[in-house]
């Protein structure tokens, strides 16, 4: 067992922030698409956007280009905490069990990914709640990040900042438990097969593959998580559209059909794909720094 290495924590946070800034407008359209069409919520009952590109154009025209970056501050803060802990914990857990990357297995990496995803997402949940509120409600939410943090706390209490934490942890367990192992195993086999070396092209192909796998696995829980986090009035259950995560899942399926659970899939994949490509290429380049 080797000593704790600080580099994966720092590099993971920096690469996560870089990837978040590069793909944020796509993430915002995903959120808008996922919260619309809820028959039991008058505010989000209307189908305002026909797809990702239509959403981007309409938001730009009606709310301005700055609206495409609504929630970017808490998103960056989230990645500074979530991304740092996620990658650092994942890499540290792997080295706890095996000393050499060649000895890693898919099962081991998946276990480490699930655990690191749960821990990091629980810690970063308040920033995720604020990011989704600011994305979904756009210019309706007045003030900056700190003001809105305080407003959520005053109106909904501490529980409001950790609303949807179980779903966030479930989604993180799925995403991290799929993406990081798929990336590592794909990269490992490409290199060991002799088809490709440890180059940026290998990193690109591996990150593209893990982004697709993560989007397919996580989209249903992402839809439910987004709707639960965007729901308000936690202190007055009678005003809540959904009684819990299972109720949200069942109501969405019943009222809108099974494929409603894959609302926002294309922007989800089109975000996870580029996000992972930017993240892993940045991370791999940072690893090469002689620090």
Curated annotation (Swiss-Prot):
Q: Which residues cross the membrane?
A: 9-26, 71-89, 106-124, 164-183, 204-224, 264-283
Name the domain of life.
Answer: Eukaryota
Which purpose does this protein serve, as stated in its record?
Probable transporter.
InterPro entries linked to this entry: Mit_carrier, Mito_Metabolite_Transporter, Mitochondrial_sb/sol_carrier, Mt_carrier_dom_sf
Give a yes or no for keyword Nucleus in this entry: no
Q: Keywords on this record? A: Membrane, Mitochondrion, Mitochondrion inner membrane, Repeat, Transmembrane, Transmembrane helix, Transport
* Full protein name: Kidney mitochondrial carrier protein 1
| Record localization | Mitochondrion inner membrane
Q: Which GO terms describe its molecular function?
A: solute:inorganic anion antiporter activity; transmembrane transporter activity
One Pfam family of this protein, by short name? Answer: Mito_carr
| Origin species | Xenopus laevis
Q: Which family does it belong to?
A: Belongs to the mitochondrial carrier (TC 2.A.29) family.
GO CC entries? mitochondrial inner membrane
Q: What is its main location?
A: mitochondrion
Which reactions is this enzyme annotated as catalysing? sulfite(in) + sulfate(out) = sulfite(out) + sulfate(in); thiosulfate(in) + sulfate(out) = thiosulfate(out) + sulfate(in); sulfate(out) + phosphate(in) = sulfate(in) + phosphate(out); oxalate(in) + sulfate(out) = oxalate(out) + sulfate(in)
- How would you describe this protein's topology in the membrane? Multi-pass membrane protein
Matching entries from PANTHER family are given as: MITOCHONDRIAL DICARBOXYLATE CARRIER-RELATED
Q: Where are the Solcar repeats?
A: 7-96, 104-189, 198-289
Any single biological process term in GO = inorganic anion transport
């Amino acid at each position: 067992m080797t000593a704790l290495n600080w580099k994966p924590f720092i590099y993971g946070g920096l690469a996560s922030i870089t990837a978040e800034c590069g793909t944020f407008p796509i993430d915002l359209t995903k959120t808008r698409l996922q919260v619309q069409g809820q028959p039991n919520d008058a505010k989000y009952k209307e189908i305002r956007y026909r797809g990702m590109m239509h959403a981007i154009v309409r938001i730009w025209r009606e709310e301005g280009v700055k609206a495409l970056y609504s929630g970017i501050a808490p998103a960056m803060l989230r990645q500074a905490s979530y991304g740092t802990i996620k990658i650092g914990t994942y890499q540290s857990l792997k080295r706890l069990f095996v000393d050499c990357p060649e000895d890693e297995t898919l099962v081991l990496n998946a276990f480490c990914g699930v655990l690191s995803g749960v821990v990091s997402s629980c810690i970063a949940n308040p920033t995720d709640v604020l990011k989704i509120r600011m994305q979904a409600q756009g210019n309706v939410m007045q003030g900056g990040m700190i003001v809105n943090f305080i407003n959520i706390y005053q109106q909904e209490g501490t529980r409001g900042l950790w609303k949807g934490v179980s779903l966030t942890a479930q989604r993180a367990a799925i995403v991290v438990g799929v993406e990081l192992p798929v990336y590592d195993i794909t990269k490992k086999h490409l290199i060991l097969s002799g088809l490709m070396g440890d180059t940026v092209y290998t990193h690109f192909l591996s990150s593209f593959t893990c982004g697709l796998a993560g989007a397919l696995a996580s989209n249903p829980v992402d839809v439910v998580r987004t709707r639960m986090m965007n729901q308000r009035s936690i202190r007055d259950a009678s005003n809540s559209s959904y009684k819990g995560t299972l109720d949200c899942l069942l109501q969405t399926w019943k009222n809108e059909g099974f494929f409603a659970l894959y609302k926002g899939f294309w922007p989800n994949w089109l975000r996870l794909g580029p996000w992972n490509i930017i993240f892993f290429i940045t991370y791999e380049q940072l690893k090469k720094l002689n620090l």
